[in-house]
Regions:
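A short beta-strand-loop structural module common to alpha/beta enzyme folds
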Residues: 1-9
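Anionic-ligand binding patches
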Residues: 12-174
Length: 174
C-alpha cells in the first residue's frame, strides 16, 4: 500500500458520490504517476447520514456525537474506486454504495469502543471488519463496499481497462 498524499479537504463536489469518486481518482493518479508498470487502485469512502457526508471524525467527541445519532438508524456508505493500468495508461472509475443499519448501542459500549481509537481512523467512525462490527445490525448491498474495497466494482473497473481480476492473482493458494 502506498499513501497518495492527496489533500482530502481540497475537493469541492456536488454530492457524496462525486466526492468519493474525485478523491479516488486523485489518489490513484498521484500514486500511478510514480509507480511504473503496476495496476494502481485508489479508494475513498464517506458515510452519508441525514444527507451529510462523514469522513473520519476530527475528535473523539465528534465520533461520539455521530455514533449516538446513528443508534437504531441507517445511512449509506459510499466508496469510490479508480484503477489505472501503469502499462497502457488506461483508467476507469466508479462508485459503490451500501446501506448500513445500526443497532442501539449503550453508552458503556460506545465508551469502550471509542477508547480503542478505532473510530478515529475510519469513515463514519465505524467499520464492518473491526470492533464496531457487533453494533451493525445489517447491510443492504455488498459488505465489501463497507470495508472499503467493493470487490464487484473492482472487478468491473478492471474489465473496463482490459485487466482480468485473475491476472492479479499471485501464486497458487489451492
Amino acid at each position: 500500500m502506498v499513501v497518495s498524499g492527496v489533500d482530502e479537504d481540497d475537493v469541492d463536489a456536488a454530492d457524496t458520490e462525486s466526492l468519493v469518486c474525485t478523491l479516488a481518482v486523485r489518489k490513484a493518479r498521484a500514486v500511478a504517476d510514480r509507480s511504473g508498470p503496476a495496476v494502481v487502485v485508489g479508494c475513498d469512502s464517506m458515510f452519508e447520514f441525514d444527507g451529510i457526508p462523514h469522513g473520519k471524525p476530527s475528535s473523539t467527541e465528534q465520533a461520539r456525537q455521530w455514533l449516538t445519532a446513528m443508534r437504531g438508524r441507517a445511512g449509506t456508505l459510499y466508496t469510490g474506486h479508480c484503477v489505472i493500468d501503469g502499462v497502457s495508461g488506461r483508467q476507469a472509475d466508479g462508485v459503490a454504495c451500501t446501506t448500513v443499519r445500526f443497532g442501539v448501542t449503550t453508552d458503556a459500549e460506545l465508551d469502550a469502543y471509542l477508547a480503542t481509537g478505532e473510530a478515529m481512523a475510519v469513515a463514519g467512525a465505524f467499520t464492518l471488519d473491526g470492533r464496531s462490527a457487533p453494533f451493525i445490525d445489517g447491510v443492504e448491498g455488498d459488505p465489501s463496499t463497507v470495508i472499503g474495497l467493493s470487490l464487484p466494482l473492482f472487478r468491473t473497473l478492471l474489465a473496463r481497462i482490459d485487466v482480468a481480476v485473475t491476472d492479479l492473482w499471485v501464486g497458487d493458494d489451492r
